[in-house]
């Protein structure tokens, strides 16, 4: 999708549809001048409440404009930037259903809205563009018309151009914000594509290739450790999970370095289980197909590092992605096994379906010992218990640093990817004690997301600024889970928001 920011008069805009965004409070003051310009009755406003994402579509007979389709677009009260994202997503989705390729939006009111809500116009432009990317997303690359390159499916189209019209007084800020929104939006869509790929299309090697391709396109280094190197390093957690697989594991290291001095070194660790059957502790068959999404953390990390590079942030951002599938096999690890992780800590495998924490354990220790970063954040679709606690809209936040937790919470609000802090008290250590090893990888029925986080904490080697995000709920939504279905790319916007603040 091409993003065009312009100061041209509305009458000169050319597109398939022209949208006029309104806040709910504006309707009382509105003289219906917009509608009269298009020969549309002012009575049309009576049923338009300007709720976020609300659309009322008209067809103009005016000869003074080049666009016949006119839409009123609701922004809610205009105080929450996320309402702009939702509105834009709704507009893009509407355009997709109508097979429209060029969208124009008159954003002339954004200046007043920004002033009233004490927000930057650039921030509103950024979130609006992000929303358009989200609403235009459609995962159809495995349809026969897409797989067969010889077929020319002219019915399958997408939005090719988004034209945003701003007043000259805010143009520079809007242009910068829209450019950032394009980067964030496109990176999130890349993450969604990876999450939506089924297990027979995405193995550990494919995740490594996705990281390498991103590095090649955007100028950051990518190193991939193979199974032999993992064996030499004694990465017992990742290797144990991989025992039941016919596909070798990978450990991808993405390393973005800014041109000047880095203000900080940030390590992002993403769980990359390409398909999770549960292993010997087999999952129920119902819903197992969604376990292709168990590498959502890995996709998020690739997208965040790419965005950091494209934005030119003055941080060193290191992405670490342990990747494998988790399958039952005659050689698979078994409940009761004891493994030795990269850290030297021994683990009793209480349940082979608690595999994500085993591969993250090796990656977290590697991050601390090899790079000693200022901040470590890991993201993982780690526990169903977190879904029970927080549902599908919010991720669980665990951290050993109050300031870092506050920053992540604020970034969640700002980015529209909300998190809620969960306890990490030492009382929970008792639940993961083992009689035969240093620690057990499961803690029983209660507080499952907390005991998983307490397990991970043992592998950060004393690091003082670490956070764990359990994104099991919002990372993948089934058809009954909301308007967005499949992989959501949750965490990409949140991480980029954080990185931009630290840069």
Swiss-Prot record:
Listed transmembrane segments: none
GO cellular component: cytoplasm
Residues of the active site: 283, 357
Compartment annotation: Cytoplasm
Annotated keywords: Aminopeptidase, Cytoplasm, Hydrolase, Manganese, Metal-binding, Protease
One Pfam family hit: Peptidase_M17
Note on cofactor: Binds 2 manganese ions per subunit.
Gene Ontology annotations of biological process type: proteolysis
CDD domains for the chain: Peptidase_M17 (cd00433)
Example of a GO MF term: manganese ion binding
Residues holding Mn(2+) 1: 276, 353, 355
Entries under PROSITE patterns matching the protein: CYTOSOL_AP
Cofactor(s) it depends on: Mn(2+)
InterPro entries: Leucine_aapep/pepB, Macro_dom-like, Peptidase_M17_C, Peptidase_M17_leu_NH2_pept, Peptidase_M17_N
Family stated for the protein in its record: Belongs to the peptidase M17 family.
Listed name of the protein: Probable cytosol aminopeptidase
Species classification: Bacteria, Pseudomonadati, Chlorobiota, Chlorobiia, Chlorobiales
């Amino acid at each position: 999708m091409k993003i065009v920011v312009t100061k041209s008069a509305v009458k000169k805009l050319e597109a398939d549809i022209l949208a006029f965004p309104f806040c709910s409070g504006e309707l009382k003051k509105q003289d219906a001048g917009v509608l009269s310009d298009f020969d549309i009755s002012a009575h049309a406003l009576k049923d338009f409440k300007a709720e976020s994402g609300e659309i009322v579509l008209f067809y103009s007979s005016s000869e003074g404009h080049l666009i016949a389709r006119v839409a009123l677009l609701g922004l809610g009260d205009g105080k929450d930037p996320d309402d702009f994202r939702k509105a834009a997503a709704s507009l893009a989705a509407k355009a997709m259903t109508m097979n429209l390729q060029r969208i124009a939006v008159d954003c002339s009111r954004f200046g007043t809205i920004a002033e009233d809500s004490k927000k930057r116009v650039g921030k509103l432009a950024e979130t609006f563009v992000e929303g358009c990317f989200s609403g235009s997303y459609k995962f159809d690359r495995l349809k026969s018309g897409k797989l067969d390159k010889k077929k020319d499916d002219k019915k399958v189209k997408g939005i090719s151009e988004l034209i945003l019209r701003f007043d000259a007084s805010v143009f520079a800020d809007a242009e910068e914000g829209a450019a950032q929104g394009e980067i964030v939006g496109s990176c999130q869509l890349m993450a969604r594509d990876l999450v939506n790929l089924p297990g027979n299309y995405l193995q550990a090697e494919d995740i490594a290739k996705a990281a390498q391709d991103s590095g090649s396109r955007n100028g950051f280094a990518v190193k991939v450790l193979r199974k032999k190197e993992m064996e030499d390093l004694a990465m017992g957690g990742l290797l144990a999970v991989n025992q039941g697989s016919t596909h070798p594991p990978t450990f991808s290291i993405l390393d973005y370095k800014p041109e000047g001095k880095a203000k900080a070194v940030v390590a992002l660790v993403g769980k990359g289980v390409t398909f999770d059957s549960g292993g010997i502790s087999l999952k129920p068959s119902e819903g197992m197909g969604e376990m292709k999404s168990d590498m959502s953390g890995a996709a998020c990390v690739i997208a965040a590092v790419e965005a950091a590079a494209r934005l030119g942030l003055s941080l060193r951002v290191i992405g670490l992605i342990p990747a494998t599938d988790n399958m039952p096999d005659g050689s698979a690890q078994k409940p009761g096994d004891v493994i030795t992780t990269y850290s030297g800590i021994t683990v009793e495998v209480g349940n082979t379906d608690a595999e994500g924490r085993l591969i993250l354990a090796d990656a977290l220790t590697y991050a601390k010992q090899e790079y000693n970063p200022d901040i470590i954040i890991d993201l993982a679709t780690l526990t169903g218990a977190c879904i029970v606690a927080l549902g599908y809209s919010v991720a669980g936040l665990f951290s050993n640093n109050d300031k870092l937790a506050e920053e992540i919470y604020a970034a969640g609000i700002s980015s529209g990817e909300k998190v809620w802090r969960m306890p990490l008290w030492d009382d929970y250590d008792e639940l993961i004690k083992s009689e035969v090893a240093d620690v057990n990888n499961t803690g029983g029925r209660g507080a499952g997301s907390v005991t998983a986080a307490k397990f991970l904490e043992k592998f950060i080697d004393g690091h003082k600024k670490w956070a764990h995000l359990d994104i099991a709920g919002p990372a993948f939504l089934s058809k009954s889970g909301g308007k967005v279905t499949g992989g959501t790319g949750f965490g990409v916007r949140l991480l980029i928001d954080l990185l931009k603040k630290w840069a």
